[in-house]
Amino acid sequence: MSNSIVGEVYHHVILDVIANSRSDFEENGVDDATLRELQNLWQSKLVATDVATFPWAQAPVGTFPIGQLFDPVSGLRTDSLDVTAPAVANSPILNNIAAIRAVQQMDTFAQQHGNSNYYSPPTPSLPQSATNISFDSSAIPNVQSNPNNTAPFPSYSSNSLQLPTNQTADSPIINDHSTANVTSTGQEHAPDSSSTNSFGGLLLPNQNSPKKSELGETESSNTTPANSRNDVPQTDGAIHDLDDAGSPSNFESNRFAIAQKADAEIYEVLKKNRILQIDGTIEDNEDEKKPPVDTPSDEAINSDLDDPDSDEAPETEEGSDIGQAIVLCLYDKVNHHKNKWKCVFRDGVVGVNGKDYLFFKANGEFEWI
C-alpha cells in the first residue's frame, strides 16, 4: 500500500467527475461558475480531512535566515540565494536587509567625521516675551503666618461672590455646576461666621438669602394639606402612619403581626387543598407511581435481533471499534466455510488511522462471530 500517490489519484478523480458533469450542467442551464464552486468546495473538504498530501494545496514558502543571506562586511550574499525560491525579490526579509545596511553606513560615516560634529539638533530658544515675566503682587492673596504650621488659605468676603441671575430666593442652594465670580482684592479679611461660603451645595447666608423663619413658613404652608389628610386613620392595609413606623418597637410589632397573618393564610390554603384518604388502611400501594401501560417491552417483536447480547459491538485490543477502518474495493474471489470467509480484493482504498492508502491486490480472511 502507498500513501504518496493518493493525492494525485483524488485529483484525477475530481477532474474526471467535473468533466463528465459539465455537459449535464450546460443542458440544465446551470452556469459554469457553479461547477467550479463545487469543485473548490470538494477540494477544500478533502484538504480538511488531511488523509493525504494534495497537489492543489498551497505549499508553505520556506523562510531564509538572515545570517545566511547577509554579511556585515560584503553585504548581501547572492550565492546563498535559491534561484527557484518564489517571490524572493519582494520578500520583507530583503527590505529589512536594505534598512540594516543603510543604518550601518550612517554609523560608519558618523564615526569617520566625529560624533560631536556630525549632527547637533537645534536647541529651541525661549521667546523674549517668555523670559520677561512680571508678577503682580496684588494678584496673589496675602498669606498670614500661622504658628501651628497649618496650610493657610485665602478668605473671601460674602460680597465677592455673585449668584447667577437665574438663582432666586426660593432656591438658595448652589449646585456644583454653578459659577461664582471671585475678585481678588489683595487684602486680608478676617473670617466671619456670617460670611462662610461654600460651593458644595450649601446655603449662602447672604443678605439677599431668605431667613429661616421664611423657609419655615413656606414648608408649613406646603405641608398643611398633608397634615389634614393624616387626621383620617388608616385601617385597610399594613402601611401605618409615619410617626408610628419611625420607632423600632412599632416596626418590630408590625412586622411580627404581618408574619403571623401570612402564616395563617398559608395554613388555610394548605388545609383546604389537603385530601384525606379514607378508602382503606394500605396507603403506600396506591400512592406509588405506576409505569405507563403503553410502553412496549424490549422483546415485543420476539426476534433474535432484539437480543441485548448482540447489541454490543466487538472491540479490538486497543479498545476502538472495528468500524473506524473502511475498505472500498473490488473483489475477484470469495470462499467461505461455515463462519470463515476468504476474499481476494483488487483496486481498492483503505482508510486507517486517519490516512488513506491505495492497493492493487489484497487478501482478506474474516470470521463471523
Swiss-Prot record:
Residues 304-319 have a biased composition (Acidic residues). One of its GO terms (molecular function) is RNA polymerase II general transcription initiation factor activity. Residues 113-210, 218-233 have a biased composition (Polar residues). One of its GO terms (biological process) is transcription by RNA polymerase II. InterPro entries: TFIIA_asu/bsu (IPR004855), TFIIA_b-brl (IPR009088). This is Transcription initiation factor IIA large subunit. It comes from the Eukaryota. The keyword Phosphoprotein applies. SUPFAM superfamilies: Transcription factor IIA (TFIIA), alpha-helical domain, Transcription factor IIA (TFIIA), beta-barrel domain. Belongs to the TFIIA subunit 1 family. It is found in: Nucleus. TFIIA is a component of the transcription machinery of RNA polymerase II and plays an important role in transcriptional activation. TFIIA in a complex with tbp mediates transcriptional activity. The modification Phosphoserine is found at residue 249. Keywords: Nucleus, Phosphoprotein, Transcription. Residues 113-248, 282-319 are annotated as: Disordered. TFIIA is a heterodimer of the large subunit and the small subunit gamma. One of its GO terms (cellular component) is cytosol.
